[in-house]
UniProtKB/Swiss-Prot annotation:
CC cofactor: heme b
GO biological process: mitochondrial electron transport, ubiquinol to cytochrome c
UniProt cross-references to SUPFAM superfamilies, sorted A to Z: a domain/subunit of cytochrome bc1 complex (Ubiquinol-cytochrome c reductase), Transmembrane di-heme cytochromes
Keywords, in A-Z order: Electron transport, Heme, Iron, Membrane, Metal-binding, Mitochondrion, Mitochondrion inner membrane, Respiratory chain, Transmembrane, Transmembrane helix, Transport, Ubiquinone
Annotated TM spans: 33-53, 77-98, 113-133, 178-198, 226-246, 288-308, 320-340, 347-367
Textual note on the cofactor: Binds 2 heme b groups non-covalently.
Function: Component of the ubiquinol-cytochrome c reductase complex (complex III or cytochrome b-c1 complex) that is part of the mitochondrial respiratory chain. The b-c1 complex mediates electron transfer from ubiquinol to cytochrome c. Contributes to the generation of a proton gradient across the mitochondrial membrane that is then used for ATP synthesis.
Organism: Berardius bairdii
Identification of the protein by name: Cytochrome b
Listed InterPro entries: Cyt_b/b6_C (IPR005798), Cyt_b/b6_C_sf (IPR036150), Cyt_b/b6_N (IPR005797), Cytb/b6-like_sf (IPR027387), Cytochrome_b (IPR030689), Cytochrome_b_C_euk/bac (IPR048260), Cytochrome_b_N_euk/bac (IPR048259), Di-haem_cyt_TM (IPR016174)
Listed GO MF terms: metal ion binding; ubiquinol-cytochrome-c reductase activity
Length: 379
């Protein structure tokens, strides 16, 4: 009997992507984050759908509707906190996934990498518009400050900002359109993720050594399905622990105060996952310069395949590059911490130094390390 899994048009596609997919036999747990991101996305879409059933995108009722979800809707509190903390888990997985690709040279799959960077941008945009929806103080002022950055664009800046706002300030029109964006973007992310996977399956997965593994492949199922299930269970455990024991740990107390355009919070800051970029933005004294630095902090990822100088793909056997990679991780964490601190003497200077180091590492030091290691191979 012919196996339906291999003949049915739809089943065949699923089979080739998740069941009989030839996979390197030596990929480590760092390769789990792709499936975890898929799981996060599905969880966010489902919890978001249930929240949208009770939420009202209107300035007068938005804050109350979120309170209503938490107090009056059956299990509304857990749906709301799973959604909020699910976003944090999403970004932890995203940064781990990008870090893995940087370390093991997966960025040499250029189409996959470029779509991945576009995905990162889209997820960041989704998280930003989503943060505005509860209409608390930090929602309102975060939206005001970040959208206002576009006014730094010469000539069209002010017009562009007012066009995005739908008026002369962040108001009802802004909230309504942000809700519309927040609803549609996850489905765009879903489509992009499918394309990301399509390009990845054209080449097959990379592995920790960075050496082609065509002579040693194993089927994805059962080996990696079971491994992914373990990863998923650990992710769900972490998410549930965070949600049930410390749901507001990563949140902002200011967001429990309804939005008030007449009172500015003492320290406006985004969610933790944007703090590194926010620190880079604040490090530049010039407004347009800051906006460009902010954009470049993520866009720089697109240039990484062009900056690869080493004859080896992975950093597994490259100690100099490893040193600079971990320095970059430490710098990323430093920037994240600086972004949460007030704009005053020691933090400002540390932030500026960390921002310079961030770009210096990616653009100069890591490519140089690759060249030195090439020389050492001959020596």
């Amino acid at each position: 009997m012919i196996n339906i899994r291999k003949t049915h048009p739809l089943m065949k596609t699923i089979n080739n992507a998740f069941i009989d997919l030839p996979t390197p036999s030596n990929i480590s747990s760092w390769w789990n984050f792709g499936s975890l991101l898929g799981l996060c996305l599905i969880m966010q879409i489902l919890t978001g759908l249930f929240l949208a059933m009770h939420y009202t995108p209107d300035t007068t009722t938005a804050f109350s509707s979120v309170a209503h979800i938490c107090r009056d809707v059956n299990y509304g509190w857990i749906i709301r906190y799973l959604h909020a903390n699910g976003a944090s888990m999403f970004f932890i997985c995203l940064y781990a996934h990008v870090g893995r690709s940087l370390y093991y040279g997966s960025y040499t799959f250029q189409e996959t990498w470029n779509i991945g960077v576009i995905l990162l941008f889209t997820v960041m945009a989704t998280a930003f518009v989503g943060y505005v929806l509860p209409w608390g103080q930090m929602s309102f002022w975060g939206a005001t400050v970040i959208t206002n950055l576009l006014s730094a664009i010469p000539y069209i800046g002010t017009t562009l900002v007012e066009w995005i706002w739908g008026g002369f300030s962040v108001d009802k029109a802004t909230l309504t359109r942000f809700f519309a964006f927040h609803f549609i973007l996850p489905f765009i992310i879903l489509t992009l993720a499918a394309v990301h996977l399509l390009f990845l399956h054209e080449t097959g997965s990379n592995n920790p050594t960075g050496i082609p593994s065509n002579m040693d492949k194993i089927p994805f199922h059962p080996y990696y399905t079971i491994k992914d299930i373990l990863g998923a269970l650990l992710l769900i455990l972490a998410l549930l622990t965070l949600t049930l024991f410390a749901p507001d740990l990563l949140g902002e107390p200011d967001n429990y105060t309804p939005a008030n355009p007449l009172s500015t919070p003492t320290h406006i800051k985004p969610e933790w996952y944007f703090l590194f970029a926010y620190a880079i933005l604040r490090s530049v004294p010039n407004k347009l310069g800051g906006v460009l630095a902010l954009l470049l902090s993520i866009l720089i990822l697109l240039f990484i395949p062009l900056l690869h100088t080493s004859k080896q793909r992975s950093m597994m056997f490259r100690p100099f590059s490893q040193f600079f990679f971990w320095l970059l991780i430490a710098d990323f964490l430093t920037l994240t911490w600086i972004g949460s601190q007030p704009v005053e003497y020691p933090y400002m200077t540390v932030g500026q130094l960390a921002s310079i180091l961030y770009f210096l590492l990616i653009l100069v030091l890591m490519p140089m390390a690759g060249l030195i290691e090439n020389k050492l191979l001959k020596w």
